Amino acid sequence: MESVIRSSAKICPFMHSATGSMQSVKALKNANLPAIAQQCPFMGKAMEQRRGYASSASGASAAAAATATASTSASNSNSSVEASASADVVDHATKEASFDYQGLFDSDLAKKRMDKSYRFFNNINRLAKEFPMAHRKLEDDKVTVWCSNDYLALSKNQEVIEVMKKTLDKYGAGAGGTRNIAGHNKHALQLEAELATLHKKEGALVFSSCFVANDAVISLLGQKIKDLVIFSDELNHASMIVGIKHASTKKHIFKHNNLDQLEELLAMYPKSTPKLIAFESVYSMSGSVADIDKICDLAEKYGALTFLDEVHAVGLYGPHGAGVAEHCNFDAHRKAGIASPEFRTVMDRVDMITGTLGKSFGTVGGYVAGSLQLIDWVRSYAPGFIFTTTLPPAVMAGAAEAIRYQRSHLDLRQDQQRHTTYVKDGLADLGIPVMPNPSHIVPVLVGNPHLAKQASDILMDKHRIYVQAINFPTVARGTERLRITPTPGHTNDLSDILMDALEDVWSTLQLPRVRDWEAQGGLLGVGDPNHVPQPNLWTKDQLTLTNNDLHPNVKQPIIEQLEVSSGIRY
């Protein structure tokens, strides 16, 4: 030890110049080396930093940073102490085990298998010329699809397909870049003009999906509007929830469709405080519907913006398929066609509407529609729009054609509603529990994740019917269900086959029927003596109308090509 101290005194500037320090070190010669090094103003500082980094998650890399600090601090010395510290760091990096990443993945997956929320994907290849049929892995293994969101079967519409083929042949497979770099084209402009016209807004902006649209718009609002408070329905889609998280602002979650609670929350803030109410028109897993008009009343009373997701409503409601907001003033919009009625409608009152091209419109993509300033603002600031490659030209052309086609084909919406009613009435006669709602969704309550999966498997393997089980986290635990979505192509004959199959499944698995839920006090409106049923959104009079009852301007509309997404020229 004496020789080490003498050698160190020749090398270390601190020990060489400070007699007192030399004596301190000699007194500690029987202590361990870290204790001695701590006395040095150079190594002591380096070791303090190393201890701080070692306590963090970055472990080895942080220790290396501490070594770098020590090296810088003692740059004038070629000391063996520096070499010792470096060796200590290397030893730390090589001897400690790495984090068990694969173990984490395995553990999380095991949890999902244990609670029956693990997702199994079925190989379903929908056949354009045999809708609603699909084949599985083998082409002769065919099933009837009863859970697709292709609500109007427009993905197989020949007019849509022909437009896509011609566009593909002329313009190729991809857009070539973002809207800012080579990806801005006439197809985007035409599609956005169609969407703005559909919702009777000043502009629209297309995204790669409505998940991205919801996330991008909501998060941008929260990040750019100082002190914004967001009020969100508890059953809002995951895309809206993610957007609210990314908004990094204050939020309140109100009980589903509970407008009394929403008003209580809004009243907590001065009218001058910026606010956003985020909600959906049709909630896809329950079929429940928001009271858009009353929510707009609250928004105007308390100074809030309204953000309406019409993903599961566009194409299905309103005389022209613009959604529930249009349906609220059905006759006025029908008589006006693509023009605006002479009074301020519910759709006019909503500040921003988002929707999808991937459900009723049969293609893929999402969008937001709103005022000219809002659309230009989102175009200019939203990373989810700015840094995303544009949708392929053929997709945008097909989506625009689908919007045009369904706008003048009221019968598509009517057939979908009639087929939905036929299935709901038939299941009610069998005592099979359908969660009551006024929309096109047929949620059949099971209430158990394992049994819901079994029911889906029996339908597929025995009856050649595909209905996906819906489990947590898509729905709350204990409310697992089968979600059935009739289309214009699901005839009454096919519906009869479905209902016979469900009767067999319910009998085989001894699943609870309506009377069983009644005995338990009811759940989600099933067997609940206090449940007040809502009338269907579509009235009997609306279902008797024909395509000829629509305004002529919807059939050969002159739609002005908007330039909002090109940049507004003041």
Swiss-Prot record:
Principal place of residence: mitochondrion
Subunit structure: Homodimer.
Name of the protein in question: 5-aminolevulinate synthase, mitochondrial
Residues the record lists as binding substrate: R119, S232, K251, T474
Pfam families per record: Aminotran_1_2
Active site residues of this protein: K359
Cellular localisation: Mitochondrion matrix
UniProt keywords, alphabetically: Acyltransferase, Heme biosynthesis, Mitochondrion, Pyridoxal phosphate, Transferase, Transit peptide
Broad class of enzyme this protein falls into: transferase
Residue range of the transit peptide in the UniProt record, numbered on this chain: 1-53
Pathway note: Porphyrin-containing compound metabolism; protoporphyrin-IX biosynthesis; 5-aminolevulinate from glycine: step 1/1
